[in-house]
Amino acid sequence: IEIPEDRSAFTRAVETMAVGAKRHFALVQLVMFGVFLVVVGVPPLLPDPPAEATILGDPTLFLKYLLWGVWFPLVFLSVILFGRIWCGVLCPMGAASELANTHGLQRPIPGWIKWEGTPALSFIVMTLYGQTLGVRDHPGAAAGLFGGTMLLAIVFGWLWGRNKRVWCRHLCPIGRVLGLYSRLGAVQFTPKVRLAGGDAYTERGICPTMIDLPRKCESRHCIEC
């Protein structure tokens, strides 16, 4: 990939870093998957912390803090700083869904998944589920929420789309929220020559979130893969 000389120094630095780091994406995603398993899967196996326990002295509280006090805030902060690079490079659910898709049935995406209200419905259902079970206070409930979401991402990726991230575009519970924050992102990728007509949806191109790249105007669906 050639980096044009007329770009700003910052833009060229970001592009060069992204191109050079792409060969390490699989390793990064594998590490993030391991972190996900530890942060989500280990706390339910540990005993309940005593009343006098602290974050630094109790592994359950420490992992709980990593999930809700570090992981989630950094996801939203990263979107503001770098766009949705979390979704395309770091998210273990998106990576697992994409991997499942490469070995899956790759069926056409049904209309009910493409419905504009599907992401909002997904967000509402997951939020109500999490609040009802108290996922922030009960590690088992958190493991059920995130583990179930991971399973759904894999199943939907295995069933539908051809080399696409159907889960990320249409079904991720926080995808639209991150898309809203990405409008503030300091880093965005745009076509060098943009065609007229505004943003368009297409399953024919190489974009995993079905963006018609030559007509791309917005960053909300771009996962910076």
Per-range role (PLM):
Residues 1-211, 220-223:
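Membrane-embedded alpha-helical bundles of multi-pass integral membrane proteins
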